[in-house]
Amino acid sequence: MPVKKKRKSPGVAAAVAEDGGLKKCKISSYCRSQPPARLISGEEHFSSKKCLAWFYEYAGPDEVVGPEGMEKFCEDIGVEPENIIMLVLAWKLEAESMGFFTKEEWLKGMTSLQCDCTEKLQNKFDFLRSQLNDISSFKNIYRYAFDFARDKDQRSLDIDTAKSMLALLLGRTWPLFSVFYQYLEQSKYRVMNKDQWYNVLEFSRTVHADLSNYDEDGAWPVLLDEFVEWQKVRQTS
């Protein structure tokens, strides 16, 4: 989860590198190297008091974990801010804004996860990753990401933020992602609205990589109609 300092587009969730003239996205690994989490005894029950004290290790005077606290939190748990596991955690906490956890979000979410310390959260990493492999949970995470990443005074995602979040969520699994990314790079679109965002996931799940089953008369957004047309021209040229 990129740390936002001024509510602009997020830090690059997937770095983009030049390769043979074509831009390809590199997705961060799920977890950087870290010491193994300490095994937690079943007798060590969840403590709301301990969870609150843990929150204050990172919160500022406004009782919010902001950019600086978030960086320290990520360092302590051994996860890069851009790592997709941070997006899953934010979803579990029902966090409203990227790069920020309120006290209410922290206590409600960590109570749900039964985590009141770093080690317990690290022991939940496999569970958090597993949510990405569940079709229903992934859909919920994907939809959550739209409102989570957008500036709250805007109805749509700016296109750079959309590309970064799509890279994080679909870059590893959608065969057409790199092509779609190239399309967005050269397109006229400067924002992506919620309907377009939702339909990109549906498109990635239902349309074949060769576009052979794409229904031109279907209720797809114009953005995707234009993408298909653009790609077919490239394939025949």
From Swiss-Prot:
Q: Looking at the UniProt record for this protein, which Gene Ontology cellular component terms does it annotate, in alphabetical order?
A: cytoplasm; nucleus; spindle; ubiquitin ligase complex
Positions carrying Phosphoserine are: 9, 41, 48
What modifications does the entry list under PTM / processing? Phosphorylation at Ser-41 is independent of cullin's interaction. Phosphorylated in response to both TICAM1 and MYD88 dependent Toll-like receptor (TLR) pathway activation. Phosphorylated in response to IL1B stimulation.
Give the principal location in a single coarse category. Answer: nucleus
UniProt keywords (A-Z) are: Cytoplasm, Cytoskeleton, Nucleus, Phosphoprotein
Q: Where in the cell is it found?
A: Nucleus; Cytoplasm, Cytoskeleton, Spindle
Entry function = Contributes to the neddylation of all cullins by transferring NEDD8 from N-terminally acetylated NEDD8-conjugating E2s enzyme to different cullin C-terminal domain-RBX complexes which is necessary for the activation of cullin-RING E3 ubiquitin ligases (CRLs). May play a role in DNA damage response and may participate in cell proliferation and anchorage-independent cell growth.
Subunit-level organization: Part of a complex that contains DCUN1D5, CUL1 and RBX1; this interaction is bridged by CUL1. Interacts (via the DCUN1 domain) with the unneddylated cullins: interacts with CUL1, CUL2, CUL3, CUL4A, CUL4B and CUL5; these interactions promote the cullin neddylation and the identity of the cullin dictates the affinity of the interaction. Interacts (via DCUN1 domain) with UBE2M (N-terminally acetylated form) and probably with UBE2F (N-terminally acetylated form).
Comment field on protein domains: The DCUN1 domain, also known as PONY domain, mediates the interaction with different cullins. The DCUN1 domain mediates the interaction with the N-terminally acetylated NEDD8-conjugating E2s enzyme leading to the NEDD8 transfer from N-terminally acetylated NEDD8-conjugating E2s enzyme to different cullin C-terminal domain-RBX complexes; the neddylation efficiency correlates with the DCUN1D5-cullin and DCUN1D5-E2 interaction affinities.
Q: What is the protein's given name?
A: DCN1-like protein 5
Q: Which organism is it from?
A: Homo sapiens (Human)
